[in-house]
Amino acid sequence: METTLRGVGVSHGVAIGEVRHMGTAVLEPPAKQIPAEDAEREQGRARKAVEAVAADLMARGNLAGGEAQAVLEAQAMMAQDPELLADVERRITVGSTAERAVYDAFAAYRALLAGAGEYLAGRVADLDDVRNRIVARLLGVPMPGVPDSDEPYVLIARDLAPADTALLDPTLVLGFVTEEGGPTSHSAILARALGVPAVVALPGAGEIPEGTVVAVDGSTGEIFVNPAEEKKARLAAEAAERKAALAAATGPGATSDGHKVPLLANIGGPADVPAAVEAGAEGVGLFRTEFLFLDDSANAPSEEKQITAYRQVLEAFPEGRVVVRVLDAGADKPLDFLTPGDEPNPALGVRGLRTLLDHPDVLRTQLTALAKAAEGLPVYLEVMAPMVADRADAKAFADACREAGLRAKFGAMVEIPSAALRARSVLQEVEFLSLGTNDLAQYTFAADRQVGAVSRLQDPWQPALLDLVALSAEAAKAEGKSCGVCGEAAADPLLACVLTGLGVTSLSMGAASLPYVRATLAKFTLAQCERAAAAARAADSAEEARTAAQAVLSGE
């Protein structure tokens, strides 16, 4: 009998196949005592296991590249946290085995994270994955993770750790479903980068029996369990039709009446450039630079290293536009040499531009490296600061850019409601705005992007969020400046039309989403997009906003 479940669709496409479940977590090691003379040996075992797991995570990151690399390197740093390792060794000194000491030390750290506010609580899944890998290595048992299979399947898991998502084989994993996570969680972002259909925040998904045939619609968030043959045929036909439409949609982004909407790519480093170029990106709307800093959390990368990496990306887009976000450290991206380790709530503390203004030498080096990397290249370089709260922040960043001799446009990311509410004031100091809708939603609704329980409030269709987008776009238009969106909202083809109708001047997303957005925009006029935007803003919920916009664009 066919049943329908609904979660949150986070990566486009349809997948039909049999269910396979993620490998179970490592069992809790027994709490047996060791003789005092064995303590040194056990400490050595623990250190070797930690080093091996950290090296494995780094290797997976190097293989995956791009955004996945940054996430996995952050996990490797978590495994090697000095305070955590000291706690492991202390527990061994008082009689614990290496595996039990790791298990208990991570449990204590887990409790700290879980109680440190929702932002850091979202890191718990990553921490659990690191713990399981270290304990599995010490016990000599298989690592938890993606099941082995020679046949394609739909993967179901409570949540997917970055180390697993990054190396999913799209030829075998047709799609995946998780019980936890949200539209801007690591799993969702990496799924879009892979082009794998995915649905998250579906409680009870783990109860679907192994081997059951399901159809996953990553656009609507629907899961059809034991779908009828007619349903499978219809979904497959719709998927084939969409694929043909995508192949036919080429060229610059524009509405059907010729209103230009540049479609840009979000990238996490040079490794993401080929996919962006292949997908027809007109440039880069968000170049995350954290990957350069995660290699060594104790020291900033040299100016020379930064110049090399930046130039690789700039050279790939001759006559194109490349928007670079300066280092966004703090909160879920802590760096030993920059971020304080004892902040009670890092998400609301010193992060983003605040961190850089406290360490002007780091900002100066990065801006100087960008200036030198762009020398002699026919590229339109733009540089923006994360976590700009007001005009004073914008002025401090613009002044730093000028002092570094940077010949580029200076911009501000709108991730804090205050920046949207006072966008016209901010624009007195900078030349463009870029809306980071992931964090803007998080701070608007007090809803952590990694916590599945509040994913409803992370939905970029929330009318309050659309109001803030409209405020920013209207301010930019009044000042004769640009206002783009580089958050995951831009990757939703229908929402991309609404954002265009709100006055957004460019859209930036993962490369895999570019064809979907290009094809959808080309179906509608600017006037239709504007009517859809007005209908969405008049709604009272995210679901109503989507339905209202869809009704306008479908002519209902």
UniProtKB/Swiss-Prot annotation:
Mind listing the GO molecular function terms for this protein?
kinase activity; metal ion binding; phosphoenolpyruvate-protein phosphotransferase activity
State which Enzyme Commission number(s) the record gives.
2.7.3.9
| Cofactor(s) needed | Mg(2+)
Can you state which reaction this protein catalyses? L-histidyl-[protein] + phosphoenolpyruvate = N(pros)-phospho-L-histidyl-[protein] + pyruvate
- Organism domain of life: Bacteria
The UniProt entry annotates the active site at: 186 (tele-phosphohistidine intermediate), 486 (proton donor)
Q: What is its main location?
A: cytoplasm
Q: Tell me a GO biological process for this protein.
A: N-acetylglucosamine transport
Where located? Answer: Cytoplasm
The cellular component terms of Gene Ontology attached to this UniProt record, alphabetical and capped at eight, are:
cytoplasm
Q: What does this protein do?
A: General (non sugar-specific) component of the phosphoenolpyruvate-dependent sugar phosphotransferase system (sugar PTS). This major carbohydrate active-transport system catalyzes the phosphorylation of incoming sugar substrates concomitantly with their translocation across the cell membrane. Enzyme I transfers the phosphoryl group from phosphoenolpyruvate (PEP) to the phosphoryl carrier protein (HPr).
Protein name per the record: Phosphoenolpyruvate-protein phosphotransferase
UniProt organism field: Streptomyces coelicolor (strain ATCC BAA-471 / A3(2) / M145)
**Source taxonomy lineage?**
Bacteria, Bacillati, Actinomycetota, Actinomycetes, Kitasatosporales
